[in-house]
Amino acid sequence: MVSRGIYRRMGLVALVVGLGLAGGCGDSEPAGRVGDECTPFAAYLGHEGAKVTLYTSITDVLADKLQRSWEKFSECTGITIDYEGSTDFEKQLVERVGAGRPPDLTVFPQPGLLASMARKGALKPATEQVATNTDKWWSADWKRYGTVDGKFYAAPFTANVKSFVWYSPKLFTSKGYTVPSSWDEMIALSDKIAASGVKPWCAGIMSGEATGWPVTDWLEDVLLRTAGAEVYDKWIAHEVAFDDPRIRAALDRVGEILKNPKYVNGGFGDVRSIAKTGFQEGGQPILDHKCAMHRQASFYASQWPNGVKIAEDGDIYAFYLPPIDSTKGKPILGAGEFLGAFSDEPAVGAVTAYLSTPEWVNSVFRLGGIVSANTGSDKTLLQTPIDRLSAGLLTDPDVTFRFDGSDMMPPAVGVGSFWRGMTEWINGKPTPAVLSKIESSWPD
């Protein structure tokens, strides 16, 4: 429901900001009146004084940017958006929904959790306007992740690209290396760098209870490039077994890099050092030219030290992880969030409608650090080269986008046996044994 009282929050790391201002768009105009600056929000008027609660896992700097992105909307419509970001998001959301006190809106980082809430009957289907906006401004690949059992529930929100390889343009220029456009070229480049006495790759997969997740991304990326999107989709749905020969072949292909002592682990040690290196530190030896390449998502940009120039002519940049089989197209592995509603109050509908438009996405782009796959957005507003590269790939009509597979699987596998299995694999356990163990963990 739309909250009009004081919402008590306990046991959370939370950011709560009410963004509706009593003064509206100007000193002489009450909230909800259309002035020159408020004309773009005319379609969302009629809800003055309403409060809409929004719950998310997004905290810190990005949370501040999101709240700033809809300030003008709140000023002009009189709708207060109470933002709460939590580091214990999934557990708390399940508890709140179970207790009958869900937030009005939730930003879901995992389609699997979204689907669970929809199947419980807790989520409301998306409004007609949100569905229209999504059909117009996002690809069908993106819409399908907000759709559960044929019914559309949640519009795409923000996005990131996982199919990136970080490198040093300065090192490449000084050594005469060129960015590879195919997998074979990338392997040939790796051999050339290894022959020079430098380990071409560096990696780290340690991440507390989530240790191992970076290898799941490697496997997913390679599977898309070898077996294709159709097999990938069936694998996620367990219509293709975890120990299927195609999955084994993809993981062995990953091993040609991550388990190759000639290739890894630049700046850290041998193959097994990968499991003892934090994912945040995994690519840092590139800065000292102790390794040349690091496969990691676009969000790794935030891990580089202050003062590092991230650009094609800078200290650090990224290139698209190249294809293996040209018949499989141009696959992109990525992730993102989806905005779902637990309330069908009109003010909630107004907020979800606005947050599914290019106009809102453009306001986020102006603040920097957040990317969207919205095809109607103005990418010239993006603040950094890596954001522009990411958005360009996400909105490329020739790209086949697929969501992070582990986020789509049952939690017992996707955030459990899959992570653990990849860690065991890095530490020397054979591919068949690892994949068979994960397969046996899939819930009935």
Regions found by a protein language model. Give the residues of each.
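Short, solvent-exposed loop/beta-turn-alpha elements that line the ligand-binding surface or hinge
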Residues: 44-46, 127-139, 205-209, 224-249, ...
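Long, aromatic- and glycine/proline-rich binding clefts that accommodate carbohydrate-like moieties
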Residues: 143, 365-417
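Extracytoplasmic "Venus flytrap"/periplasmic binding protein-like
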Residues: 72-140, 144, 170-181, 284-285, ...
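Extracytoplasmic ligand-binding clamshell segments of periplasmic binding protein
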Residues: 207, 229-307
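Hinge/lid segment of periplasmic solute-binding proteins
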Residues: 37-46, 111-163, 193, 214
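Periplasmic solute-binding protein
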Residues: 117-121, 142-179, 184-187, 205-235, ...
